[in-house]
């Protein structure tokens, strides 16, 4: 069982602590600042050793976008992060060009 879940789909009903990003299918987060904060928080949890689950409805576009953002937080360049996510997670992760551009522009405040 995960220690924490970050979901871009409100249909999930986990029994563990979780956060939800309002993010329409094939679209972008409705609140970029909130999405960025939640992605950074989930990354920090994973980095500290917690088991973090990331998900959406199908597990491709939104989930892939979140994973690619976490790869960026790990120090990989945005374009390389998209490629890495498709190679290591799912070849069709990040559904749309709009989502690709969002990931490429992912830039949380320096910590």
Predicted features, each with a name:
Residues 27-29, 66, 109:
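A generic structural micro-environment signature
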Residues 70-75, 107-109:
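A compact, surface-exposed functional segment
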Residues 50-72:
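A phosphate-binding catalytic loop at a beta-strand-loop-alpha-helix junction
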Residues 1-51, 72-74, 78-99:
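Cysteine-based protein phosphatase catalytic domain of the PTP/DSP
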Residues 95-111:
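Charged phosphate-binding loop/patch that engages nucleotide di/tri-phosphates or the phosphate backbone
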């Amino acid at each position: 069982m995960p220690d924490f879940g970050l979901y871009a789909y409100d249909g999930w009903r986990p029994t563990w602590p979780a956060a939800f990003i309002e993010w329409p299918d094939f679209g972008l987060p409705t609140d970029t600042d909130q999405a960025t904060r939640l992605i950074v928080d989930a990354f920090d949890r994973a980095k500290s050793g917690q088991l973090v689950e990331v998900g959406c409805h199908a597990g491709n576009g939104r989930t892939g976008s979140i994973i690619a953002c976490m790869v960026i937080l790990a120090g990989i360049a945005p374009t390389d992060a998209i490629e890495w996510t498709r190679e290591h997670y799912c070849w069709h992760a990040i559904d749309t060009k709009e989502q690709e551009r969002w990931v490429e522009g992912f830039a949380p405040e320096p910590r």
